[in-house]
Amino acid sequence: MVQTIDQAASLRGTVSLPADKSISHRSALLSALGTGRSRVYNFPDSADPQSTLDCVRTLGIEAGRNDEGVLAIHGRGLGGLHPPSEPLDCGNSGTTMRLLSGMMAGQEFGSVLTGDESLQQRPMERIADPLQAMGARIDLRSGHAPIRIRPQRSDGLRPLEYRLPVASAQVKSCVLLAGLYASGRTVVIETTPSRDHTERMLGLEVQEVGGERHIIVEEDHTVPAVDWSVPGDFSGAAFFLVAGTLVPDSELHLDDVGLNPSRTALLDVLDGMGADITVENERVQGSEPVGDITVRSASLSGIDIGGRLIPNLIDEIPVIAVAAACAEGRTEIRDAEELRVKETDRLHAMAQNLEALGAKVQEREDGLIIDGNGPNLLGAAVTSHDDHRIAMAMGVAGLVAHGTTTISDAECARVSFPGFWDELSRVSVS
């Protein structure tokens, strides 16, 4: 599908966001490991969380929606999963594959985890290494999926104290889930904090030791049946926060947005660039902070982004690059080499696409240098590289660029935000 975007005169209205993808994945997996019925309110229809739900069903877990759309998942406890009769298809979802691998590593039956062509190119040694250190028997194909996990011995996995070599919520969560099946205390040590949904939702002990976070899974930790309420996805909100900032005479409202501090570094970056964003009605929903956001048009200035900020805005860097291209002055993004092993090489994809729109971009091994010249992009033909975040970031760029922008393979936005293009059109004023 080719999506056509014309320059917008303004953006107005209240944005309808999809449910938070990260929390949705975890709600399905943890509900499967609980004992009894859990309910998930606002579970999304986007492709990635559906991949997780499909895998849970393949493991013998009953899950379905009632007439009000509430998802009920009937968990069978840590030892109640059934051997899968077919490979566990994770689709395009790295979160599904990495977190599910932690669960499967502790089972007394074997499993194979696979995914689409893109997912089979993403690195999986980063989860295989700690799982093998716990005694899991895992085979990869040249460091990638399919992942073959052989049956675990009845005495369980070995406990592990694991220091994350890089900040990664997926690797951390994989080890924590495997730790539920270990014969002793498992500790994951973070030097740089990453998103913390897993430890929040599991209710794990977290200790601050010498500037590091120690997340602890005790041998006897159980997973209760819980009713989860999934807030709006902050990563989905990010596109409208940047769009509402860049398009003149705009005012957008985003309600019930997840505001987990490990996810919202974009707010700090945009504030530092000069954005006009307010957060109101802050509250706690389950284990997660939630609030309502209003964004109004503002002129931006360049900024330096790197270090400990990066793990807490890694998904937002493509749309930050759009903001930087429309700001006045230089923006430097560094320490973001993780973006080279996402659904596509996001650093290269954004550099290529923004240059096509007339931006001045230098690509570095771990980031980008963008010399902004105000909102002076020119419409052009660009490609999503079949990456949902690239597609949506370029949709935002198209709203600002003079003329018409076309985005090829734009249907991939449905991976995380099925109604994105309709929502963008609905709030746009020509």
UniProtKB/Swiss-Prot annotation:
GO MF term (any one): 3-phosphoshikimate 1-carboxyvinyltransferase activity
Residues at the catalytic site: 315 (proton acceptor)
Binding site for phosphoenolpyruvate: 21, 94, 122, 170, 346, 389
Pathway membership, UniProt: Metabolic intermediate biosynthesis; chorismate biosynthesis; chorismate from D-erythrose 4-phosphate and phosphoenolpyruvate: step 6/7
EC number of this enzyme: 2.5.1.19
Cellular compartment(s): Cytoplasm
Annotated Pfam families: EPSP_synthase
Swiss-Prot/TrEMBL catalytic activity: 3-phosphoshikimate + phosphoenolpyruvate = 5-O-(1-carboxyvinyl)-3-phosphoshikimate + phosphate
GO BP field: amino acid biosynthetic process; aromatic amino acid family biosynthetic process; chorismate biosynthetic process
CDD domains: EPSP_synthase
Sites where the protein binds 3-phosphoshikimate: 21-22, 26, 168, 170, 315, 342
Classification via SUPFAM superfamilies: EPT/RTPC-like (SSF55205)
One GO cellular component term: cytoplasm
Signal peptide: none
Function text: Catalyzes the transfer of the enolpyruvyl moiety of phosphoenolpyruvate (PEP) to the 5-hydroxyl of shikimate-3-phosphate (S3P) to produce enolpyruvyl shikimate-3-phosphate and inorganic phosphate.
HAMAP family: EPSP_synth (MF_00210)
Subunit structure: Monomer.
Family membership: Belongs to the EPSP synthase family.
Name used for this protein in its record: 3-phosphoshikimate 1-carboxyvinyltransferase
Organism: Salinibacter ruber (strain DSM 13855 / M31)
Lineage of the organism: Bacteria, Pseudomonadati, Rhodothermota, Rhodothermia, Rhodothermales
Gene name in the database record: aroA
